[in-house]
Amino acid sequence: MRTVLRLLPLFIVHVLIIVVYSQGHPGLVAGENRYVTDAVNLMESGEQAVGKDPVPWNGPGYPLFLVPFKILRAPNITMRLANAFLLLLGSLYLIRALRYYVSGKWAYVAVYCMGLYPVVLKYLPRMITEPICIFLACGLAFHMIHMKRNPERRTLHLVLAGLYLGFLALAKVLFGYVIALAIVFFLVLALVQRKRSALRALLVTLIALAVCVPYLYKNYTRTGKPFYWAQAGGLSLYWMSSPFEEEYGDWLTGTKPWLGNYWKAEKHKRFMESLQDLPAVERDDTLRREAVRNIKDHPGKFAKNWVANVTRLFIHHPFSYKGQAMRDLRSMVPGSALLVLCLLCVIPTVANWRSIPAEVRQVFLIALFYVAGNSVLSAYDRMLLPVFPMMVVWLTYILAHTVQPGCFRLRFH
């Protein structure tokens, strides 16, 4: 109860932001309609995607979360206020996880920094995947840490960590590929090092994959493709591969550009028109092939797009055909500080790798796999939020245990 009271000011700030935002946006805004529509489809037919070409655009995780609200006919503000409760629960998770490595005071400082991070506040009032992903990431970090620190309940925390990672993949399908990469990595690590910590991490990823099997099987019956997560990946990779000098790999149109023409995508108009009548899976495959061709033909331009994309992931800039505006500072200033801090912490992380607790290394690696995957897809600042709590765990540990606060000298072990 004391922890909840100490987090109450942060919770009140979150609630006020959501209430004020909802007063100005009582209806659905860009990005929300897709998830609400999916939730209604799940409620009415048990299917996320309906119609003549029922291939989901995104994972079912967040629409499933919205289903109870739609059953109860909850207004939009109620569904948005749920985000404040998700962040409160996530903060409780994170406080308990960080207490193993820092004092209570610094654990609260870290959690408040996360909760007041401007990008978190920007997307908090919206019915999109990021708030629930923050909660799930906090839960994943907590259970992976307790899996090592609480031997008496190790099996419980192992299973729960797997469930949280699995639901993260259902909410943000990129985590599906993170799971696949992590399975291979931890399997090799377990075979080479023969350490139980690596074996436990492997079991977590296998449980996470098992959580996703029903969804993957349903997609397989629709598409004939194993391990097919959603149809958005091809378009994202296509924009990232753009060979035109004025473009930086960002998303130039709405989610379905073949349904209409946008001036930003004028250079892509002919190719986009050729996709209009294709089935979803064939369209996705065509986009992927064209993206790969662009990358092979213009590797230097793709490298430039990649640098711009990583920068955009942290500071929400640059964008194609768009100049800077004062409002961009909301993301650029804190994002630049976060990016610099992460780059500075890479050095002590590498230097002290063997002395960093296994559970912190594992949380860091999952976040690293996700960021690496997002770096080759068209990215924005909101896409960093699903691993932001894991980054907080990593940064807090590194700053507390490998850097001397008085003079910032590294401690090498």
Regions found by a protein language model. Give the residues of each.
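Extracytoplasmic catalytic/substrate-binding loops of multi-pass membrane glycan-assembly enzymes
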Residues: G24-D38, Q48, D53-F65, A74-I77, ...
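Multi-pass, polyprenyl lipid-linked donor-dependent membrane glycosyltransferases
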Residues: A30, W57, T78-L86, V109-M144, ...
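Loop-to-helix entry region of an early transmembrane alpha helix in multi-pass inner-membrane enzymes
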Residues: P56, P60-V67, L72-L92, Y123, ...
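Membrane-interface anchor segments at the N-terminal boundary of transmembrane helices
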Residues: P75-T78, N83, T286-L287, R293-F364
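Transmembrane-helix motifs of polytopic, lipid-linked glycan transferases
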Residues: L81-V102, L116, G139, L341-L344
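Transmembrane-helix signature of polytopic, membrane-embedded enzymes
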Residues: L94-L116, I134-F135, R153-L156, A358-R361
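Membrane-interface transmembrane helices that cradle and orient dolichyl/undecaprenyl
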Residues: V102-G104, L140-L160, L168, L189-V192, ...
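Membrane-proximal stem/loop segments at transmembrane-domain junctions that anchor or position
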Residues: Y228-A308
